[in-house]
Structures are given as C-alpha cells and as structure tokens.
Amino acid sequence: MIVPIQCEYYALEGLGQLVGNVDLVKANLNPDLEISKIVLVMYDSRTKISKQVADEVREYFGGRVCKQIIPRSVRLSEAPSYGQPITVFDPTSRGAIAYKELAREVLNE
C-alpha cells in the first residue's frame, strides 16, 4: 500500500489512525497488508510545519518514505477541475515533474 500524506499537522494524526487500522486488518483479514511507501504531498518549503511533518514521518517510517516529495502547486490543484491529470494539464509544471520522478522511484525499487 502506498500512502500519501499531506505535510500538515492533522494529516499526522490521520496517519496514526491509518496505521492502527492497518494493524487491525492485518490481524483479522489480511496478514500480508503492509504500508510499503509513504509519499509526502502538498509540501510547502516556505512553512515550518511542512518540514516538521516530513521530519517526523521520516523518523517513524524511515526508508519507507519516498525521497521524491510532491510540492504544493497551484497547477496541481487546478488540473482536476479540468478533468485532466497534471501530466496532461501542464506536463512541464513542478508538480508533473515531481509525479514523474516519484513514478520512476517507485518502479525502480
């Protein structure tokens, strides 16, 4: 399972709840279920909270956190309203490039 997490405070709480739910599912339904990757999304390098969340997630999950971070981007938020993926809507945007790099990272592991 690949889990995206927004680099916001409440997302950390949600991630904690998700880990608990994954443990319940593993114990009762699917012992093979694992969080294989965590993707940091909506990262804003101008804010302290983004860095703090990224640091805490990396500290807890270690190597399961993808190196490629998806930045906060106006173009990324606009693409769905046009019914298009970012790679079609604006293929040269920072967000599109970040998602392409993330795909390469995940596929190469």
Locate the predicted segments by residue:
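Conserved catalytic-core segment of NTP-binding enzymes
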Residues: 1-74
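C-terminal alpha-helix
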Residues: 101-109
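Short, charged/polar low-complexity linear motifs in solvent-exposed/disordered segments
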Residues: 30, 95, 105-106
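C-terminal boundary of histidine-terminating zinc-finger modules
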Residues: 79-101
